From Swiss-Prot:
Principal location: cytoplasm
Entry keywords, A to Z: Antioxidant, Cytoplasm, Oxidoreductase, Peroxidase, Redox-active center
Name of the molecule in the record: Peroxiredoxin
Enzymatic class: oxidoreductase
UniProt record, GO biological process: cell redox homeostasis
Alphabetized SUPFAM superfamilies for the sequence: Thioredoxin-like
Length: 215
């Protein structure tokens, strides 16, 4: 993979050493065996970003149950991050238990494609989900004006981990799909023999589903 190209889904997350509010971190190696969500925000001490950090903090234990860590990032300084965290903890009564990367020169943000035309001096709301092998599994970009749906990020991680475990694919709005509820879809058959074995199953040989345990 080119050193300058933005990492894509299915590729290894690029190796880098970053400075955070919890010290230096080597990505992705320091999270080997764990998933992590790296998310960028436009700036400290801004209303939408504050609501996002509050929500991430409130949902932190749900991420932990999925063997997943959180890492924030913006082009603010480490001092700014620390002051903002202290303000959140004092005024909103919630602890920020995860590190925030300080990237004042924007090197990490540029490497990960977090600087868009909307602003050349701040990051958009990007999300990278990286699995326990250091592979990028999901990339999301939100404009600055729209706060992220933290429950959707959790849903996507649950779906990805189920896909890995059970060898299935998940339908729209899983686990609340309008057609099959919390069931999952079997991958497409690879041979004519496999296709014929599925004849008569709902909905058809190319679209079959089943129940799986999610725990």
């Amino acid at each position: 993979m080119s050193e300058e190209r933005i990492p894509l889904i299915g590729e290894r997350f690029p190796e880098m050493e970053v400075i955070t509010t919890q010290g230096r971190i080597k990505l992705p190696d320091d999270y080997k065996g764990r998933w992590f969500v790296l998310f960028s925000h436009p700036g400290d001490f801004t209303p939408v970003c504050t609501t996002e950090f509050y929500s991430f903090a409130k949902k932190y234990e749900e991420f932990k149950k999925l063997n997943t860590e959180l890492i924030g990032l913006s082009v603010d300084s480490n001092i700014s991050h620390i002051e903002w965290i202290m303000w959140i903890e004092k005024n909103l009564k919630v602890e920020i238990p995860f590190p925030i990367i300080a990237d004042p020169m924007g090197n990490v943000a540029k490497r990960l494609g977090m600087i868009h035309a909307q602003s050349s001096t701040a990051t958009v709301r990007a999300v990278f989900v990286v699995d326990d092998k250091g592979v990028v599994r999901l990339i999301l970009y939100y404009p600055m004006e729209i706060g992220r749906n933290i429950d959707e990020i959790l849903r996507a991680i649950r779906a990805l981990q189920l896909v890995d475990k059970a060898g299935v694919v998940t339908p729209a709005n899983w686990p609340n799909n309008e057609l099959i509820g919390d069931k999952v879809i079997n991958p497409a058959p690879r041979t004519i023999k496999d296709a014929k074995m599925r004849l008569g199953q709902p909905f058809d040989w190319w679209f079959t589903y089943k129940e799986v345990k999610t725990t």
